């Protein structure tokens, strides 16, 4: 992801948000409106939720060579923690997982769950899964 590249000199927050927006848009088949008979791909929704988990973890832990956070996402004061950032992303992840489950149940399919170690996390494909 561009925002976590140490050589990137641009706006890291913009890069993260643009990446997340593009991924979520792809998970929803680039549609703004949905109708009762519209279909979504449960695997794209599931992968999108996992990618957001990975991005949140990277935002909370990636540091520069000098030891400073590349992106400050949480309150740094240990006496006054503010974890609203993680709560908001947790809510989005939960909604995506719930939608993936609903779509999978509707289609009578199961979601392919990949076992991953968070330390070696790679982003999962969302846009490249193709259209139905």
Question: Where is each model-derived feature located?
Answer:
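Mature extracellular/secreted ectodomains of secretory-pathway proteins
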Residues: 1-118
